[in-house]
Amino acid sequence: MPLAERLAHVQCAIADHPPQCLLAASKHVTAETLRGAYALGLRHFGENYLQEALDKQTALRDLDGVVWHFIGRIQRNKTAALARHFDWVESVDRPLIAERLHAARAGMVAPLNVLIEVAISGEDSKGGCAPEEVPELALAISRLSHLRLRGLMALVHPQAEQADADFRRMAELFFALQQTPVHADLDTLSMGTSADYLQALQHSATEIRLGTILFGARTQESL
């Protein structure tokens, strides 16, 4: 199915509960395909791997208004490049990473938008800080002037019943954080992927990350 049809299907499905941001999860998607996605109106692209993302940014540098999000695991030695080349980093999970991003962002015009990744499902295969660590990490980030904390991100459990509980807990955590004066301007709850984005929207997600449902199954060889 062409990308235009896939996108139209998604837009129809979310019409009653549109998110603030439809993030195209573009891991292993070619720059030329992203150029086509841009022509269809998509502006936010989420990348998992630094070098792959940098290559695409170079190939698409003629396009105005593209917003690059990093959504993968963060390696300490990559923080400087992430801070310089991305508009958002959505997988901050500990103070050290936040501090390194802050230091590397110094001198740039705008602060780096960041989300705290929360290990809400308890699965070892997924990154993120423990839910009980979120308030302390959020406070630490709020003190770093070159970062702007926008909210929380999570990947929920793949089983529907557990996913529902995870979505609910994430919404509760987000709204509780938002009630504190220092975090009153938080505006982003990023959760929901191709398999569960409608369920996520029912639980107040403001950003959904869609890959397979837009681009089909991908492998690294697709590039």
Kindly label every feature range from the protein language model.
Residues 205-223:
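Gly/Pro- and small hydrophobic-enriched strand-loop and loop-to-helix capping segments
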